[in-house]
């Protein structure tokens, strides 16, 4: 059998090793100059005013919800077809996640679904830029402005995603992820961008014990050696080791995403003749970052179930992923919301399969996946 082809593999090289070596030799391992440089680079990438690096996108979501004073009695609108950390953070703060359905073919939450879910208790809306494509954020933001509700963009899949000519996160508040499978990675990490100066100040405190400054601030600006707690906070800062890797990856972003796009185009051309259904692209002008390439495997249409397809690909040495199992079908949320029905989400959650997609894949690797799909479709 050929070497196992994983669903994803980080694109690491000598540049990342050199960046880590530089940090180790500098003596400043935790939050410091590399964090500062990463934050500045994301302001340049997105065009937003403030950037706050954190230990994960989940951490970023947690402190953003906290800074917005979301808690018991509040509701937060979010799709169910998302990673469970968003729902978990809402729930841990005592608020209620209000899960809404998505478009059947783009898997994006729609402005109409969001607006129909608003109540007097709605405190925030969290749209997801899914799989590397953008949600219709202008329309969603307009709803937030009309009702006076905060919008927090889940941009975990959207480093390199553009909407109507502007990078995701160009205005408002958005949260990016640098997890190991993301378009750029530093193993674990995340970053928040915002145009709200007061929110940015609160996020910086909350990510570091509620202190007004961190150790690098004190060294750089000569502030008092003992910082003071201004509000209870967390230990969510990013180390400079991670930030240095993320910076190096960010410098390669155009190259990395171009390769993802080439593989996605190869898949799209082949799937035109197969029963497996890729996602539809959004109707609005955009640049897709191709974080994921997803097909829907309908047993009646394809002659094989999604789970059987994934197992058959595994037997052929090909890895796949599932993004995502709907949150409201998982034990805790199923028991908490037993009557919730989201038809489009449920239909897709039972059929979606993420194919291998990462920059170091070769054309031959993609051909191998396509050949396996052709065989499993009986062609």
Swiss-Prot record:
GO function terms (MF aspect): pyridoxal phosphate binding; UDP-4-amino-4-deoxy-L-arabinose aminotransferase
Keyword Endoplasmic reticulum annotated: no
Enzymatic class: transferase
Catalytic activity: UDP-4-amino-4-deoxy-beta-L-arabinose + 2-oxoglutarate = UDP-beta-L-threo-pentopyranos-4-ulose + L-glutamate
Pfam families: DegT_DnrJ_EryC1 (PF01041)
Record keywords: Aminotransferase, Antibiotic resistance, Lipid A biosynthesis, Lipid biosynthesis, Lipid metabolism, Lipopolysaccharide biosynthesis, Pyridoxal phosphate, Transferase
UniProt keyword Lipid metabolism present: yes
Swiss-Prot/TrEMBL GO biological process terms: lipid A biosynthetic process; lipopolysaccharide biosynthetic process; response to antibiotic
Record PTM N6-(pyridoxal phosphate)lysine, positions in chain: 182
Pathway(s) this gene product operates in, as recorded in its UniProt entry: Nucleotide-sugar biosynthesis; UDP-4-deoxy-4-formamido-beta-L-arabinose biosynthesis; UDP-4-deoxy-4-formamido-beta-L-arabinose from UDP-alpha-D-glucuronate: step 2/3; Bacterial outer membrane biogenesis; lipopolysaccharide biosynthesis
GO annotations of cellular component type: membrane
InterPro entries associated with the record: ArnB_NH2Trfase, DegT/StrS_aminotransferase, PyrdxlP-dep_Trfase, PyrdxlP-dep_Trfase_major, PyrdxlP-dep_Trfase_small
Cofactor: pyridoxal 5'-phosphate
EC number, UniProt record: 2.6.1.87
Job description of the protein: Catalyzes the conversion of UDP-4-keto-arabinose (UDP-Ara4O) to UDP-4-amino-4-deoxy-L-arabinose (UDP-L-Ara4N). The modified arabinose is attached to lipid A and is required for resistance to polymyxin and cationic antimicrobial peptides.
Family: Belongs to the DegT/DnrJ/EryC1 family. ArnB subfamily.
NCBIfam families linked: PRK11658.1
Complexes and interactors: Homodimer.
The name this protein goes by in its record: UDP-4-amino-4-deoxy-L-arabinose--oxoglutarate aminotransferase
Gene coding for it: arnB
């Amino acid at each position: 059998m050929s070497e196992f082809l994983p669903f994803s593999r980080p694109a690491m090289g000598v540049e990342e090793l050199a960046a880590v070596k530089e940090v180790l030799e500098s003596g400043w391992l935790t939050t410091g100059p590399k964090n500062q440089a990463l934050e500045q680079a994301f302001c340049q990438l997105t065009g937003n005013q403030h950037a706050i690096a954190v230990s994960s996108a989940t951490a970023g979501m947690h402190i953003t919800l906290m800074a917005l004073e979301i808690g018991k009695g509040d509701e937060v609108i979010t799709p169910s077809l998302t990673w469970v950390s968003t729902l978990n953070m809402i729930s841990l703060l005592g608020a209620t996640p209000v899960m809404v359905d998505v478009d059947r073919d783009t898997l994006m939450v729609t402005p109409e679904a969001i607006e129909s879910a608003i109540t007097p208790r709605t405190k925030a809306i969290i749209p997801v830029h899914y799989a590397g494509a953008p949600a219709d954020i202008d329309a969603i933001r307009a709803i937030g402005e009309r009702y006076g509700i905060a919008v927090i963009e889940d941009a975990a899949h959207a480093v390199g995603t553009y909407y109507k000519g502007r990078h995701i996160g160009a205005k408002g508040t958005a949260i990016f992820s640098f997890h190991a499978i993301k378009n750029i990675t530093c193993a674990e990490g995340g970053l928040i961008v915002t145009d709200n100066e007061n929110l940015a100040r609160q996020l910086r405190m909350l990510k570091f014990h509620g202190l007004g400054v961190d150790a690098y601030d004190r060294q750089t600006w000569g502030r008092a050696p003992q910082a003071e707690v201004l509000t209870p906070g967390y230990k969510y800062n990013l180390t400079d080791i991670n930030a240095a890797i993320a910076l190096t990856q960010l410098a390669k972003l155009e190259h990395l995403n171009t390769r993802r796009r080439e593989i996605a185009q190869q898949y799209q051309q082949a799937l035109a003749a197969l029963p497996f259904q890729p996602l539809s692209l959004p109707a609005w002008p955009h640049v897709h970052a191709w974080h994921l390439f997803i097909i829907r495997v309908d047993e009646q249409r394809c002659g094989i179930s999604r789970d059987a397809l994934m197992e058959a690909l595994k037997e052929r040495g090909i890895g796949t992923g599932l993004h995502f199992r709907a949150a409201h079908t998982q034990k805790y949320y199923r028991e908490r919301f037993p009557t919730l029905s989201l038809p489009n989400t449920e239909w897709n959650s039972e059929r979606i399969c993420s194919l291998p997609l990462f920059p170091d894949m070769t054309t031959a690797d993609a051909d191998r996946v396509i050949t396996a799909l052709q065989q499993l479709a009986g062609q």
